[in-house]
Amino acid sequence: MNASHPELKWLEDPRVFAVNRLDAHSDHTWYTEAGDLRQSLDGAWRFAYSASPAARPADFWQPDASLDGFDEIAVPGHIEMQGYGQIQYINTMYPWDGRHALRPPHIAWDDTPVGSYVKTFTLDQALQGKRVCVSFQGVERAFYCWCNGHFVGYSEDSFTPADFDLTAFLQEGENRLCVEVYKNCSGSWLEDQDFFRFFGIFRSVYLYAKPALHIEDLWLQAGLEPDNTTGTLAPRLRLSAAEGASLEGCTLHCTVAAPGGAVLWDAPMPLRADGSGYVYGLPVRLPGIRKWDHSDPALYTVTLTLRDAAGAVQETVPYQTGFRRFGLRDGVMELNGERIIFNGVNRHEWNPASGRAIGPEDMYRAMETFRRNNINAVRTCHYPDQTLWYELCDQNGIYMIDEANLESHGSWQKMSAVEPSWNVPGSLPEWRDCVVDRARSMFERDKNHTAILIWSCGNESYAGEDILAMSDFFHQNDPGRLVHYEGVFHCRAFDQISDIESRMYAKPDEIRAYLESRPAKPFILCEYMHDMGNSLGGMESYIRLLEYPQYQGGFVWDYMDQALWQAGVRGRRLGYGGDFGERPTDYAFSANGIVFADGEEKPAMQDLRYWYDTPARRAAHDARNAKEAAAFRLPALRAGGPLTVIEGDVNLGVEGDGFALQFSYAEGGLASLRKAGGPEWVWRAPRPALWRAATENDKGCGFPVRSAAWMAADAFPKAEGWQVEEKSSQQVRIRYTFSFPTVPGASADLTYTVTGSALRVDAVYHGVPGAPELPVFGVRMSTLHPAARVCWTGLSGETYPDRYKGASFGRWAETPHIPAYLVPQDCGVHMDTRTLTLEQQDAACRTTAALTVRMADDTPFAFSALPNTAQELESAAHRDELPRTGRTVLTIMGAVRGVGGIDSWGTDVEPACRICGEEDHSVSFIVEL
């Protein structure tokens, strides 16, 4: 659509989404003898924030308009992240839910913030005298643009470029570019992604000049013949000429260089036209190439040089491409003739200091994490990313699902129910051009990237004729890639939209049933293993599905926690939904990453790295662990002397060679443990451990409600009595019995056996018919003084019954700490432990006291050593709300509930990783004295 004057009514008209905007084009760069023809407009802009359109400075775009009262703002950057408006995180609901009664395509005119931007610039010498355009790489959500008082254009779609021709509006010397950004428009109904809601110019802005003859659009169309050694190149170009110039007689020269620099092709490329507006280069066959894939992402540099009829070079375009072949055969996706497996993640663009306005360093770091952890695929959820990310995926062999900027789940998912009565875009004709334009804009920009194997029509937008039109666009324009859309699962009438059967969070048994039904389509999980908090348990059940050829992997949800730095109780902390005073919100549901918001890997990453490795390397890892564990031998306990028993009215004292213990009848257990004149180790007598702080997955499946009795039991056990079962100079054994305030009532015994050099502890839980599942069973003790270090022999990192295979067996050490889960929850468990040692240290980090615990009866145990109790973790909403106790809470466990990972809103952990309250459970260990 073209227009010479702007109209506010466009904001509510889904048929108006681009006014005077240039056609979308490939992301290629070009240069001339004068060098690069780009000029960045990033940096400081003048800025005014208005709470509504009525309050905006309506004439700020006039060339002589005063900017008094305007501030400065950084571009790129979100407006909310620079002190204006309201930061808001929300998942499914629309941001205005409960504040404004709206239906598509309308907006709340009195609650639509506006950002007014002004940038003055002088054209660089290299751009002067040429056709000059401006490119906005990303603006949320809708914007109008003026140059030197002239209306330039209007655009929606926050995540693809919007280019406008400025040539007719530029003047010598200083120029004034004005941009008016609106937070809400009809397009807002299509951008209901599960993320923080921002607006503003959040990606780069730059000017670019076109030579007299210019390659407007380029599609290399690189391919691979079935021999996997012969590459093909069939460029398609769209050319333009400046006023007074002519394309008549122009020529194109093509050079192809191998990764090492060797030139494989260097010759003129004849062009032909077919009346479509494109010209086509004569196809080229290149024998002896290396096929592109994850293991060898070989990229070849194609250089196209455009000359005019006189032979003068007009511009040179370099582009890196790989040669590969992708498609379906017998219902299986194949890359270069071999079945492909996606070991993928979903990735939002995110930085905790700047939101989605990320920089190159964020992308480089993410790519390093991908390569280090065997991640070979990424889905750009749920919008196209910055161009640099695609280049990095090309270079590193990361397979891509490139997803269009479309998500409207708030229009058909209400309180988790499917209710599409006013779903957009659906089959509404007034929305069709808008969503197809989003598909086209993504396709045209990204089509040359070798890494992209699949186009996605968007996310969670139900289905209908409009999304079918998107799919048809991809199929008609790019037969060399597949089309993905998960939403047809909810509306099978439009099953033809997707070439792939794609699901979210389907359970392994459901997938198995599909795979055994002789399906026509291959299966992927576009989202699975919801890594909210302490999660990612049970991944093995999905990996085992790879035995079915049509199961081709999935994409973990998701890569990085979405959280923002804010002022907290003790300084800077990461805030989540609701922390910024916004309502409505979905609180911490934004924290689902396999890395924390600061980019550090979560403890679960070692398991993802293991399961995303090759079967051969997993087998080698398992064999290495088995060998190391089998070779481990407990050292013999030292020879101990006779025991001295001191019988008091309230305490039973036991002293031996280098140690002294006290067992309290009143306290109900071990009240004191000292070694060789060292410090006191026991703060309060150990108790049966019956509760862990609920994980996000526990909460989601209702486990804390079903098993809440154990929280009270853990906090308020009753020592019913004691019995001294043996008392001699060789051995002392005392048993304590505990009852718990549960219905039905339950009990446990804690037995201490002292010998000349050791204290053995045996804990037994007595199962009761009708008792709910336990989260844990073991023994918990707090030290009087904090341990500076805990060392253990067993599995590395944080492990659970359903998340331990990626750990390595060995000797490990760490400072007792709470991992950086956004919301405190159970953490720090170490499975399959043989020994552990708590160390106290002086200021020089020298060990001053140590307490060692070893397994009993050759039976390993699990343990955690944390600075906080389960109750303290349960009560805190942020890590900085945890009290500084000055103690270490040591929990030794014989039974541990898994963490789960299928989803965080209803699915329980796998049955094998639950703890039945009707059965007996026990744990035994030995404390060296």
Model-identified regions with their sequence ranges:
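Extended substrate-binding grooves/exosites of carbohydrate-active enzymes
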Residues: 1-33, 150, 189, 313-635
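Accessory beta-strand-rich segments of carbohydrate-active enzymes
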Residues: 2-16, 25-27, 32, 46-50, ...
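An acidic-aromatic loop/edge-strand motif
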Residues: 78-107, 156-158, 166-231, 235, ...
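Beta-strand/loop-rich accessory regions of lumenal/periplasmic or secreted enzymes
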Residues: 80-82, 88-90, 183, 293, ...
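Short strand-edge motifs at loop-to-beta-strand transitions and within beta-strands
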Residues: 117-119, 160-164, 277-284, 921
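Short strand-turn-strand beta-turns centered on an Asx-Gly dipeptide
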Residues: 146-152, 259, 336, 657, ...
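Extended acidic/polar, glycine-enriched regions
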Residues: 168-174, 238-327
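Surface beta-strand/loop "capping" patches
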Residues: 212-243, 607-650, 763
